[in-house]
């Protein structure tokens, strides 16, 4: 993903304020509620039958944090997202058989959650930079599929 120096500092500055547990749980929860077909990858998570069940589910929160911990690692390696996410791409492709479109959906949901949590601080310029990052991460995660 090509980010200018200014875009890199913009995304890094905001990311430094992100509570990965809180934001991760909300992002994964929203993905599961807004795109319910994604729930099939989380059969072991128990009750995902309603929005309140999803958002109250400890496994959703825990996995959301895990997802954002990986995303945080990617934020440290914006110039090498394919290399950073190579093993996760392989896992999601070969073992979990996740539709790569879901990575794009999760990235867009993450942008919504960041906007919701950071309000006025999440300017159109910040959003534009984050859209590039989540698109780059989605492409890197889908890399093994090609």
Swiss-Prot record:
One MF annotation (Gene Ontology) recorded for this entry: heme binding
Domain Globin, first and last residues per copy: 2-146
TM ranges: none
UniProt: heme b binding residues: 63, 92
Expressing tissues: Red blood cells.
InterPro entries found in the cross-reference section: Globin, Globin-like_sf, Globin/Proto, Hemoglobin_b, Hemoglobin_oxygen_transport
GO biological process, one term: hydrogen peroxide catabolic process
Residues the record lists as Phosphoserine modifications: 44
Modified residues (N-acetylvaline): 1
Presence of the UniProt keyword Kinase in the record: no
One Gene Ontology cellular component: hemoglobin complex
Record PTM N6-acetyllysine, positions in chain: 59, 82, 144
Family listed: Belongs to the globin family.
Quaternary structure note: Heterotetramer of two alpha chains and two beta chains.
Protein's name according to its UniProt entry: Hemoglobin subunit beta
UniProt source species: Macrotus californicus (Californian leaf-nosed bat)
Gene that produces this protein: HBB
